[in-house]
Amino acid sequence: MKKILALLVIAPLLVSCSGNKNQADNEAFIKDTNGFEILMGQFAHNIENIWGLKEVLIAGPKDYVKYTDQYQTRSHINFDAGTITVETIATTDPAAHLRQAIITTLLMGDDPGSIDLYSDANDIQISKEPFLYGQVLDNNGEPIRWEWRAAHFADYLLQNKMQKRTSGLHVIWSVTLQLVPNHLDKRAHKYLPLVRQSAEKYGVEESLILAIMQTESSFNPYAVSGSDALGLMQVVQHTAGRDVFKMKGKSGQPSRSYLFDPANNIDAGTAYLSILQNTYLGGIQNATSRRYAVITSYNGGAGSVLRVFSSDKNQAVNIINNMAPGDVFQTLTTKHPSGESRRYLVKVNSAQKSYRRH
C-alpha cells in the first residue's frame, strides 16, 4: 500500500519538469502515462490479493467504485446499467459493513475531488444535497436526502435483499438496488445550466456537449479511465487540457482536482470542442461534415481523422469539402483505423439526435 500511496503523490508531479519544447512535452506525456499505468497496475494487484483473481473491480468512465474497510467493502454504481451494488468480504458482522457503505453511498455529495477512488479511506462526506437524490427511491417510493431515511432503507435492504455467494476462498455478502428508470435524464438535468453556459461561451451546440457527456461518462462526475481521462467529459490533462490552457493563455495543464470539478470539466471539454471546431478542423466548410469530424476527433484526435482522407492535412480538408456529409460519415465509420473512434461517432451522433428532440 505504501507503493500505491507514493504513486498517488508522484503521478500528478511527473510532468512538472517539462519545458515548452515539443520533445519535453512528449517526454512528460510518456512519464505521466507510465506513472498512471504503474499506479493502476499496483492498485489492481492489491485488489486481486484481497478479493481474488475474478473479483478485481476498478472505477471507470461509467462505473463508480469505492473501497473502504481496508479494501474489504466496496460500493459500485454502474451508471449504464442503473444499478448500485454494495459488497463485503468482511468475516465479522458483514451486515454492519454493508449498512455503513449503503448509507454513505446514498448520501454522498457530487464533489469528486473530495473522494480518493484509489484508496480505502472512508473520505465520503455525507451531503445535504446527495448526488443520487432522486435517482434512488426507498422501499416507500421516496427519494433519499436524510441520514435517517438512508438508514431505514439500508435496514430494509439488509433484511430483504442481502445475497451471499462464494468466490475462491471468500464469502461475499452483497446488496443490489436499482436506480430509477430515468436516472440518465436526472443526471443530465443536473448539469444543464453549466452546459448552456459553456455552449454560449464557446459557440458549441448544447446537444453535442450533452451527447459527448453521455457517451463519455453517462454523466458520472467521478469518471476516470485507464488513459487517465477525467470527469464528465473525460478530459485528458496532457492533451486536451494542455490545448485548452494554451487557448486561455495559461501555461502547463489543468490539475486532476481542477478537472474533477464539474464546472471546470464541462468548460474545458467544451473549449476543446471549440478548438477542434474552429481551429484544427475549421477549414471544413459543411457544418454537418465538420461536426462528424469534430466528434471523431474528440475521441481519437484531429490528426487521425484527417489522415483517413489524406496524409496531407490541407488535401484532406479539400477532399472532405468535395464530399457529401453522408459520405464523410460513412468514411469515418468504416475507414478510421480505430474501431473505438468508428463506434464513437455512431454513438455520439445518435445521442445528439435524441437531445435535439428535447
Swiss-Prot record:
Keywords noted in UniProt: Cell outer membrane, Cell wall biogenesis/degradation, Lipoprotein, Lyase, Membrane, Palmitate, Signal
Pfam families per record: Mltc_N, SLT
EC annotation from Swiss-Prot or TrEMBL: 4.2.2.n1
Signal peptide (from-to): 1-16
Lipidation residue positions, type N-palmitoyl cysteine: 17
Topological category with respect to the lipid bilayer: Lipid-anchor
Stretches assigned to coiled coil: none
Compartments reported by the entry: Cell outer membrane
Catalytic activity: Exolytic cleavage of the (1->4)-beta-glycosidic linkage between N-acetylmuramic acid (MurNAc) and N-acetylglucosamine (GlcNAc) residues in peptidoglycan, from either the reducing or the non-reducing ends of the peptidoglycan chains, with concomitant formation of a 1,6-anhydrobond in the MurNAc residue
Function in brief: Murein-degrading enzyme. May play a role in recycling of muropeptides during cell elongation and/or cell division.
Family: Belongs to the transglycosylase Slt family.
HAMAP family per the UniProt record, alphabetical: MltC (MF_01616)
Protein name: Membrane-bound lytic murein transglycosylase C
Gene encoding the protein: mltC
